[in-house]
Amino acid sequence: MSINATLLGQAISFALFVWFCIKFVWPPLMNAIEERQKKIADGLADAGRAAKDLELAQAKATEQLKEAKVTANEIIEQANKRKAQIVEEAKAEADAERAKIIAQGKAEIENERSRVKDDLRKQVAALAVLGAERILERSIDQAAHSDIVDKLVAEI
């Protein structure tokens, strides 16, 4: 095999091509590849941070939901206690009012009874006086006396 000028020219051309590529083509390609690798690494790191942030946010949301449920249950419990208290107060007030009304009714009945007794005593006294007057007007005869007493008893 003989080395001729064509082969030597091709070798020199290839060497110049390689030098040109190393000097002018290779650095921008490497920069582009490195930038792309950096973007991918940053994207993966961001995705990892986002996943952690999402996990933290979900944990926080779950905790807040639990706290909200506890708070809601406490509020409901307080409302139920207040409701029971209001009902008890209303019952006590109603019982007091009922007792007051009953006491007033009993007092009115007692007053009316006393008034009726007084009226009845007055009427009995009036009838007794009337009977005594009639007895005194008539002669003190036993038959007349019995007749007047029977009439008085019938009137009473």
From Swiss-Prot:
It is a single-pass membrane protein. GO terms for molecular function: proton-transporting ATP synthase activity, rotational mechanism; proton-transporting ATPase activity, rotational mechanism. One of its GO terms (cellular component) is plasma membrane. It comes from the Bacteria. InterPro entries: ATP_synth_B-like_membr_sf (IPR028987), ATP_synth_b/b'su_bac/chlpt (IPR002146), ATP_synth_F0_bsu_bac (IPR005864), ATP_synthase_B_chain (IPR050059). It is found in: Cell inner membrane. The keyword tRNA processing does not apply. Belongs to the ATPase B chain family. F-type ATPases have 2 components, F(1) - the catalytic core - and F(0) - the membrane proton channel. F(1) has five subunits: alpha(3), beta(3), gamma(1), delta(1), epsilon(1). F(0) has three main subunits: a(1), b(2) and c(10-14). The alpha and beta chains form an alternating ring which encloses part of the gamma chain. F(1) is attached to F(0) by a central stalk formed by the gamma and epsilon chains, while a peripheral stalk is formed by the delta and b chains. F(1)F(0) ATP synthase produces ATP from ADP in the presence of a proton or sodium gradient. F-type ATPases consist of two structural domains, F(1) containing the extramembraneous catalytic core and F(0) containing the membrane proton channel, linked together by a central stalk and a peripheral stalk. During catalysis, ATP synthesis in the catalytic domain of F(1) is coupled via a rotary mechanism of the central stalk subunits to proton translocation. Component of the F(0) channel, it forms part of the peripheral stalk, linking F(1) to F(0). PANTHER family: ATP SYNTHASE SUBUNIT B (PTHR33445:SF1), ATP SYNTHASE SUBUNIT B', CHLOROPLASTIC (PTHR33445). This is ATP synthase subunit b. It comes from Shewanella sp. (strain W3-18-1).
